Every structure is written in C-alpha cells, then in structure tokens.
Amino acid sequence: MLSQSEVYVFEADKMIQGFVGLNDEYIEGIFVSDGMQSCGIGKLLLDYIKDKKERLQLNVYQKNARAISFYQREGFIIQCEGLDEATGEKEYTMLWKQK
C-alpha cells in the first residue's frame, strides 16, 4: 500500500506514535497509535502535508464516522461515494484544496 509513498512520522519518547503516507496528492492513510489518539497527532501530520500540497485527496469508509468528522473539520469535502472492491466496503472520496 505505501511502497511508492512519501511517509512522514511523528515521534514521541523515541517511538513512532503516528505516520501519514502520501502518494503525490493522495493520502494513502493516517495512522496514530491507540494510546495517542485524540492528542492532536493526526492534525499535526495533516497540517504538515497541507503545507506541502495545493490539494489532497483520500478515501474513507462510510462507516468510519469519526474519521469523516475529522477530515471535514480539517476542510475536506465529500466528492463522491464508491465501493472498495478489495473489501466490499462503501467509501467516500474526499478532497481538500488550499485556500
């Protein structure tokens, strides 16, 4: 999944606590360790890549209401819905553009 991606990490106490994978303008994923969620790490990672890009795109499962809410707070807009063929899960494609 992340083989051709740029990966940026967040470290705390000499341990990786989160990372984001970016393939051009597409966010492959943002991951934060369970014990560090809701501490602002995801926002820090997202802000870092927002500074590098004019626009960003991602897919998120429709059932992941927490992630959808996070991305909407960060300025992402739902563009369309689709189906992840690998999992059969319904998903949204979301887009963010630099203002």
What are these regions (language model features)?
Residues 5-18:
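Conserved beta-hairpin
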Residues 20-28:
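Conserved donor-binding loop and adjoining core beta-sheet/short helix segment
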Residues 27-37, 60-61:
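A short, internal acetyl-CoA/4′-phosphopantetheine-binding micro-motif in the GNAT/acyltransferase core
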Residues 38-51, 69-73:
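Conserved acetyl-CoA-binding loop-helix of GNAT-fold acetyltransferases
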Residues 42, 46, 63-67, 83-90:
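Short glycine/proline-centered loop/turn elements that form peptide/ligand docking sites
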Residues 51-63:
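Conserved GNAT acetyl-CoA-binding A-motif
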Residues 72-80:
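Conserved acetyl-CoA-binding loop of GNAT-fold acetyltransferases
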